[in-house]
Amino acid sequence: MLGRPKFVLASGSPRRLALLNQAGIEPDALRPADIDETPTRGELPRSCANRLARAKAEAALKSVQLDDDLRGAFVLAADTVVAVGRRILPKAELVDEASQCLRLLSGRNHRVYTAICLVTPKESFRQRLIETKVRFKRLNEDDIEAYVGSGEWRGKAGGYAVQGIAGTFVVKIVGSYTNIVGLPLYETISLLGGEGFPIRAGWLNAS
């Protein structure tokens, strides 16, 4: 990785890491931010995603500033919010939460918002918010019970993982697929490239 700036991913998400790897980018370090991700009272989905992505970036930056090997690195944070109308769905941890999410999503449209926040080596903050519309098929109780039993929903915004079994529930997607997974690749790479990060440096070894 010599010859390019250091890059830190402010996330412990295997999905976000895999998406970056898909684009030929291997972070020099992972700095997951331990923050309260509870929406504030009356907070709208867009505002929530933007606020949490910024908070994660700020927390990771503090860690990077204390590390001589990483000081001056690019820092990337992201937060994904699933919403039905103005209602923000939880990042389900309990069976009842997951079941409730799936019943709410059944047979209707919902929106997935991912906010990305990039801190440049000069410690400027750059943010973008990406929205994808998703429609689920009508789920019956057998679908819900079996999916909840799979456990793949745990910790996922909206109680599902589109890259897993829940992909079979999706009737239609309008917008970025990788946004639903947790990191909109096109917008992320465009943002990095626009701030001077050598986005093609890892392509030669990508295979």
UniProtKB/Swiss-Prot annotation:
GO MF: dTTP diphosphatase activity; UTP diphosphatase activity
Catalytic reaction equation(s): dTTP + H2O = dTMP + diphosphate + H(+); UTP + H2O = UMP + diphosphate + H(+)
Localisation: Cytoplasm
Active site: D79
Parts of the chain that traverse the membrane: none
Entry EC number(s): 3.6.1.9
Pfam family, one: Maf
Biological processes per GO annotation: nucleotide metabolic process
Top-rank taxon: Bacteria
Keywords, alphabetical: Cytoplasm, Hydrolase, Nucleotide metabolism
CC cofactor: a divalent metal cation
SUPFAM superfamilies: ITPase-like
Site-annotated residues for Important for substrate specificity: R15, T80, Q163
Sections of the chain in a coiled coil: none
Cellular-component GO terms for this entry: cytoplasm
Similarity comment: family membership: Belongs to the Maf family. YhdE subfamily.
Role of this protein: Nucleoside triphosphate pyrophosphatase that hydrolyzes dTTP and UTP. May have a dual role in cell division arrest and in preventing the incorporation of modified nucleotides into cellular nucleic acids.
Record protein name field: dTTP/UTP pyrophosphatase
